[in-house]
A protein has these predicted regions:
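A structural signal for short, hydrophobic/glycine-enriched beta-strand patches
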Residues: 2-151
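A transmembrane-helix-recognition feature enriched in membrane-embedded lipid enzymes
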Residues: 147-167
Length: 168
């Protein structure tokens, strides 16, 4: 599901979608997304990423703050990480992040989405409903039983996203 283009064609607007945090650190699913992001940032030293995710009712910190801290603690330059800390779902992740990207002067017509493999299809679909041309950088899900569980959950979430796009 990695559909990145040549380095000079990679979208300027890059968003890492949040996932649940555990205490003051990322969950396994989120850690895999962040590790994928770190590799991308090493390969594309001119790119800035937006980490997107608010604070769930059972979370002590915003997903964005946990993601930013993880990236910086693992070698990312803080000046290359922008936090979007209000989103509570995938649509808001993309919408709120695009507003931050636009304010920072990035072209938001194309977006590189970093998320889990099971989540990529729906994330790209939602980006298209927001008039963005999406590209994906997917992290793997392991163990396989988690992938099965999350993929089944995504079927229903995708149906909901499709319905919302059609009916507001």
């Amino acid at each position: 599901q990695d559909s990145i283009m040549a380095q000079d064609e990679t979208p300027a607007f890059i968003v890492v979608l949040g996932a649940q945090v555990q205490g003051d650190g990322p969950s396994l699913t989120l850690k895999k997304r962040l590790d994928k992001t770190l590799t991308f940032m090493q390969e594309h030293p001119d790119k800035t990423v937006i980490v997107s995710g608010g604070q769930g009712p059972d979370e002590a910190y915003t997903e964005a703050s946990v993601m930013a801290r993880y990236l910086i603690e693992h070698g990312a330059d803080a000046s290359r990480v922008i936090e979007e800390d209000k989103a509570s779902n995938t649509r808001e992740n993309l919408l709120f992040s695009s507003k931050l990207a636009e304010a920072a002067g990035f072209d938001t017509s194309r977006v590189l989405i970093v998320t889990s493999d099971f989540h990529m299809c729906r994330a790209k679909y939602i980006a298209r409903t927001l008039s963005m041309e999406p590209y994906g950088l997917a992290s793997d899900t392991w163990p396989w039983i988690l992938k099965v569980n999350y993929t089944l959950r995504e079927v229903f979430a995708f149906a909901k996203a499709f319905w919302q796009a059609r009916h507001g």
